[in-house]
């Protein structure tokens, strides 16, 4: 696994891969070799996928990293990927909402995301669709967008930066490590969120 992320044994903490918008084979040919080399089996406890994996072979690849996958349906996904638009789960001391980007409009509107967060009554809201990774706190909630793992193009950005998030959850503290791939090398930024008790 890429350096800079602490791993620990369950149930003290969990390492969650947040990934989405691969768009393979429609908008991208594959996940980069560098990302594949760093996403090794046995390190990650769970995967949250924001959709647009597109085909079964890519979902099968994600299962080689971790068999515990929760995914929502993206608008380009084959029927076998998921038929769920949103779901809520508990990770550590957090209620986490995972939502399809096409159920949110506009997808970068913080007030629209906050409405969805309140509707689901979650501490962390995970969404995709922007193809730009972000992790920020807004109105007492942690919002995570893993961006596009392949850097798949959009109508507004022909060259997004490939990215994903590793979320380290320890009780009521979550640290999001945002991995981006630029010019053949990985950089990591982090954002921390603690739930008020």
Where are these regions (language model features)?
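Active-site neighborhood of phospho(di)ester-bond hydrolases with catalytic His/Asp-centered motifs
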Residues: 18-20, 46-52, 70-74, 98-100, ...
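Conserved beta-sheet core of the metallophosphoesterase superfamily
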Residues: 70, 107-173
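N-terminal active-site segment of His-dependent metallophosphoesterases
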Residues: 11-68, 77-85, 93, 163, ...
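Single conserved hydrophobic/aromatic residue that forms the stacking wall/gate
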Residues: 1-12
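Helix-adjacent hinge/juxtasegments
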Residues: 68-122
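Active-site environment of divalent metal-dependent phosphoester hydrolases
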Residues: 24-27, 53-58, 76-82, 104-108, ...
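Beta-strand-turn-beta hairpins that frame and shape the catalytic cleft
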Residues: 13-17, 88-97, 138-143, 169-175
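Charged phosphate-binding loop/patch that engages nucleotide di/tri-phosphates or the phosphate backbone
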Residues: 170-197
